[in-house]
Amino acid sequence: MPKRSFTKDDIRKFAEEENVRYLRLQFTDILGTIKNVEVPVSQLEKVLDNEMMFDGSSIEGFVRIEESDMYLHPDLDTWVIFPWTAGQGKVARLICDVFKTDGTPFEGDPRANLKRVLRRMEDMGFTDFNLGPEPEFFLFKLDEKGEPTLELNDDGGYFDLAPTDLGENCRRDIVLELEDMGFDIEASHHEVAPGQHEIDFKYADAVTACDNIQTFKLVVKTIARKHNLHATFMPKPLFGVNGSGMHFNVSLFKGKENAFFDPEGDLQLTDTAYQFTAGVLKNARGFTAVCNPIVNSYKRLVPGYEAPCYIAWSGKNRSPLVRVPTSRGLSTRIEVRSVDPAANPYMALAAILEAGLDGIENKLEVPEPVNQNIYEMNREEREAVGIQDLPSTLYTALKAMRENKSIKNALGNHIYNQFINSKSIEWDYYRTQVSEWEREQYIKQY
């Protein structure tokens, strides 16, 4: 979605010309869940004057009940009309930043926090941080009550097409709706697992790209429902098949120059690119809980299913955590492959950016690239070349997060503490559950 710039008068004009009936004021909590306050268009002036208040104590990770009043400040450049509402009273959307009653940005707002880390980047002499995400999702059938089943909508595979790819029509409608909303779609295709799909859209600046991810998730789920399907961004909904990732392709710029590209450098990469990569590798264990934030995330990060389990980098193969795709010039980028679509994109990107800036600031040296298939290396071989494992559970990821300074800098005290508290509760709840697998394995044997 290209960057746009709208004024209050533009918004008034759009609302009148398009006969908009409702305004959806959207923001995101620390768990990555989209929240919104919907108001009739008669409240437009109040919205434009930043006077829309909501109860922050009702939102995960925000504030206590005694300090609950929050204000929504709309980003006018995010104005869009949901195409599927045209026949029932048009609904327009504005993404908002969350402010406190004293007029300052709320430190628990993930979007505002990402902007804070971007200001640190600018203080270091960089102008832009771009992100191209690759979100994947599964489509499941609904039952007669409209509830999701565990029955996939097809048994297709990588790049399959109809009649094997039964999700093709749904995916095509998703693309059409996204394009109507201003997305620049680069490709859409069936993924490796049955019922799994990927739609790639053009990179954008950090905040816009994260806004786009949240919009994308909403559109995918909405249009899937119209096809009597349930779209899920759960990383590993089924055993024995590939999980869903959301690879982050990132690049730093100084003005119009890609700070990662050097035509004369080794692999045509700059020292900045190598230092950024070194920072990502150094802090990877610390930011894993944010990039892979739910118990189920770690069912994806296992050998054999094309997801990274090991902390290494390569310019060639796809088994390490970090890959440098072959494109150069302005397209030079670093791909962080561990991120999954359950992640809060604002927090995940802030974590990766802060990790990379740590590498640049401290002039960290990147280890040698690993160009062989790490999945085929045994533990002794991996240890011999200094390859560490990513955390294998949410518990170990939270432990690594507590021991890492970079991730605390990336999130700020409020989000950092609230996130760890929320996820620790989630882990404690999970570890007391008794699964069907346990009953099948043990109830007769013991």
UniProtKB/Swiss-Prot annotation:
Mg(2+) 1 binds at residues 134, 247, 335. This is Glutamine synthetase. The keyword Ligase applies. GO terms for biological process: glutamine biosynthetic process. It comes from Staphylococcus epidermidis (strain ATCC 35984 / DSM 28319 / BCRC 17069 / CCUG 31568 / BM 3577 / RP62A). ATP binds at residues 186, 251, 318, 323. Inhibited by glutamine. It is found in: Cytoplasm. Oligomer of 12 subunits arranged in the form of two hexagons. In its feedback-inhibited form, interacts with TnrA in order to block its DNA-binding activity. Signal peptide: none annotated. It comes from the Bacteria. Residues 110-446 form the GS catalytic domain. It catalyses: L-glutamate + NH4(+) + ATP = L-glutamine + ADP + phosphate + H(+). GO terms for cellular component: cytoplasm. NCBIfam families: GlnA. Residues 18-103 form the GS beta-grasp domain.
